[in-house]
């Protein structure tokens, strides 16, 4: 599927490759590995992908023993993966680089060598947890990757023109007309329900089956819960309690996240690390109140008053109806026709 971040990769290849490695970081399952490999296939003569989530010790040992002998390192990597490497025409991808921080530290020497280009991918939560024993290379350029936006969703649905029409009418301050507006809102409601996680979008584009889409989204939510337990060491219970409370807080009129809903007399300082972790992992978007809305928003940020959103609207839908096991086709259809009150009634009755 077409992703806007691809153009940023091309710009890096033209302007920064050879002087920096590119690190794509973001939440799990947003499509980092996919776009990295598609970029490599289209823009390079050859590429070598090392998935540190799956690779064995025999490959990891190469980075431990041959950083002072890069000729031998490249020879072994080329032979192990059966990929011929061409100087200045090949890309080496470190996928899930957070699983082996020593490879990330090696970027300094690999970029200085200059023979090949380097692209790293990793989930933000893990990368920041696994840097304490390495020197973070200054030769990295960071870009963040998010779930698919509305325009990318339209592309996946085979509609390449609607967003251009919306944009032009908006810039001209003119109405789209009832027919086009109705069509745009229909697509937009589909996007809000399905969300922007690539696997869910692809399934919906192919099958239009909400049950299958919901199963995919629930698998991602399960993965996020496992990550919380594994990586939010020391305050995982607080992270999980905030995560579970997000749908209920957003259902309220003001949508402000009240820590008292988690524990009576709860204080912000008790949950500050947990909120930061969710935001840092890009599982949630934390929105703080600004007491003086101007250019310097951070200068007037009230950290005690906040709203907590999910990083993806489709995941929010599945998360909100979590106790039902699966969101039924009936609920999805009511959401599609903007009947949220009917959905709430059906949910409470069940």
Question: Where are the predicted features?
Answer:
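Pre-Walker A adenine-sensing motif
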Residues: 3-16
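Hydrophobic anchor at the beta1->P-loop junction of P-loop NTPases
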Residues: 24
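Conserved lysine of the Walker
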Residues: 32
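Hydrophobic positions on the alpha1 helix immediately C-terminal to the Walker A/P-loop
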Residues: 35
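Short glycine-rich substrate-engagement loop in P-loop NTPases that contacts/grips substrate
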Residues: 58-81
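Structural recognition of the conserved hydrophobic beta-strand(s) that form the central parallel beta-sheet
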Residues: 117-123
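Interdomain motor-coupling "hinge/lid" segment immediately C-terminal to the ATP-binding subdomain
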Residues: 131-248
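Accessory nucleic acid-recognition modules appended to NTPase machines
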Residues: 206, 210-349
